[in-house]
């Protein structure tokens, strides 16, 4: 009998199921995957290096462009890290608004992931339904910050501006009618025979394996570990809000889908609580060395004009030191580590992207599965190459 050779198959980088610019070299034994080798770096833009040449405020928009489907979560991590170095306390209204928008961002991210994961295995309807709801949330982004995606809204010292009149009421209206659409998708997918055949038992992973690979977020919780930074290391006002941590049992593609569906419902509840408890007051720190003065003040005071000019030309100087802050981003633990040398620019900024750890386990998760399952596995990882390649 002649020697049997495995076949090498290139998957991507132009493949629609690759979720961006993933090049995957698959070693196949017939239809079965023997090895999956992800080639990353096709979207590398040198973000961490670029940040070293910008002031602390100018570095902020780079974070929107990392995981570009959940931008505000990353701004949040960066702002918290800079505030930790500055030892700056922000007003309570700013904290509530930050949490409100971070939870809307979580909904935004999970809607995209669930609908595209369903599309990858052949279900088109959820995409058409859920993108309609995403559009409404992007409109809230636009009304608050002026941009649909790259908001640059959460800034060190507070927020860019207060929300316009009527926005809170419109978010409240949206949150009331939104669960109906989630119920519709739930009905369409959760007990669907074909959906379950494509996702149940695919790339199962245990808690120990998930921790060994550095998983976080829904990927870790789907394996059965109730680890959520909003509960275990509360930041902002999460310790004053009431929510549950949904977990899975088997750590397979189906459980990851269920965890994300449950997280959307928890985020809806958190948004409602933020709206009910929303206090009045300022939205940025009063420290004029960090946050710009109000427009009205600049028309009357020369001091205010000088502060404004200095802030936007030179930027503020951050005390020497280092800080690491992680937030529970929709994809997992998103961390920012900044080393400051006392100047107006970060000496070093290291970004911990959750998707990076998830993608490195792809070989382990895909081994022994069929070629058709690779689309379901990649869809369940929820990877975006902006943050992986940085």
UniProtKB/Swiss-Prot annotation:
Membrane topology: Peripheral membrane protein
GO cellular component terms, A-Z: plasma membrane
Residues spanning the signal sequence: none
Enzyme Commission number(s) of this protein: 7.1.1.-
Function: NDH-1 shuttles electrons from NADH, via FMN and iron-sulfur (Fe-S) centers, to quinones in the respiratory chain. The immediate electron acceptor for the enzyme in this species is believed to be ubiquinone. Couples the redox reaction to proton translocation (for every two electrons transferred, four hydrogen ions are translocated across the cytoplasmic membrane), and thus conserves the redox energy in a proton gradient.
Gene name of this polypeptide: nuoD
Keywords: Cell membrane, Membrane, NAD, Quinone, Translocase, Transport, Ubiquinone
Tree of life domain: Bacteria
Keyword Membrane among record annotations: yes
Cellular location(s): Cell membrane
Family (UniProt): Belongs to the complex I 49 kDa subunit family.
One GO molecular-function entry: quinone binding
Descriptive protein name: NADH-quinone oxidoreductase subunit D
InterPro entries: NADH_Q_OxRdtase_suD, NADH_UbQ_OxRdtase_49kDa_CS, NDH1_su_D/H, NiFe-Hase_large
SUPFAM superfamilies per record: HydB/Nqo4-like
